[in-house]
Amino acid sequence: MGSSQSTPLTNGIKAALNGDEKLYAFPSKIAYQLEDVRPYNLTIPVKPAAVTYPKTASQVAAIVKVAADAGLKVQPRCGGHSYANYCIGGVDGAVVIDLRHLQHFQMDRSTWKAKVGGGTLLGDLTKRMHDAGNRAMAHGTCPQVGLGGHATIGGLGPSSRLWGAALDHVEEVEVVLADSRIVRASATENPDIFWAVKGAGASFGIVTEFVVRTEPEPGECVHYSYSFTVGSYATLAATFKTWQKFVSDPELTRKFASEVIISEAGMIVSGTFFGSEAEFNKLEMNKKFPGYKDHHTLVFRDWLGLVAHWGETVALRLAGGLAAPLVAKSLTFNGADLIPDKAIDSLFSYLERVEKGTLVWFIIFDLAGGAVNDVPQEATAYAHRDALFYLQSYAVGIGKVKSSTRKFLTGVNTTIRNGMPGGQDFGAYPGYVDPTLVNGPLEYWRTNLPRLQQIKSAVDPRDIFHNPQSVPLAGTPVPTSAPKIAMVRVRVRKVLAKLCF
């Protein structure tokens, strides 16, 4: 895929890939950035030392050894949707291992567990599971996102309240470690590695195969949406208060998925109900959200059709997932730390007056809870088991992201934080990476970070699998105040779980 000067790195990569020029690229290649690097966030320029496209786990292992021998960092890429370009290293000089060729799929019809290649995209996974017996698993809505990153960092989607996060479906992995060993990991084999991969995978290895538990596809489902125009931000604030009260009801069925999307055009309350239209109508959504401009409900009896509809909705919102200059922030909220009415009023007042610097911005509140909360926080590296809903805000610049746009999104988080009673450990969802966080690892992994650091030091002591916010080695100073607060929240969650679910 391009000529290069002869170095130990280039020679080693060529040898690892049997000299197949289609399976590697170096910076000397014409159109290297456009065709091979392909950064998702155009505001963060990154030039990897090499981009590779192995076809087997053995080739992945060989590339890891070559990179480690050269003293370089390694990061895997599957879908390539990292907000901070961590899948290409996050900074210059990493070796990228693109997993696009790892596409194998096999369903065991006796157990309904599937073996899935680490390079599989969510859209392909949905189709393959359907064709193998009308099976499904929880995952996000963007079909171009890769399972390799999604199921090793969290993996939330509309069906997560029913089935859990994507990583909760994972029962075994084949993973390439920093010393280039290929190992199997599960709850009984290499359990520490398995624990770490389920929430912080990119810091520990490259998953070349997943074994996942599947569920029968749901039957009839209802997709709903209620649109509200900007007319008055005070009106939108009242609608959001209604939504928060509704979704925080301990008796809310797990069949109900929902999100609030705030944008330049107004606000949308939308989601999916995993049940019949008759069941959905009993929720009386029309009465709960009066004053809407438009209201639509679509009944799906075809799982592929519903998942495709999710993807189309996301495509409209994200411009098809194309690379763009963007900035993003996130927060998490649990049932014990709901946003007070005054803070909601402050947020919408802020949105009304602030200079945003772009017309393409979104503030999204995604309902979580349900089955995701059933799993104890210490059971996997994924640490946001007490989350009721997530805030994700992002904006796209035209040509570049303006400073006013960055200030706008920072102000969203600041306004909410300042309006909270105090003492909250919000944390940040590791799938919504934010390179501006002062202590990203603590925000992402919370009380699980110390154990992750110990495992990291044991299996990757040279920190080969690294990006700017990956799990640091043991001994790296970590603040202790936030984790203590987090443990209080976990105890509260466990009490609430007995009452709520």
Task: Name every feature range the model reports, one short phrase each.
Residues 1-501:
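Soluble FAD-dependent oxygen oxidases
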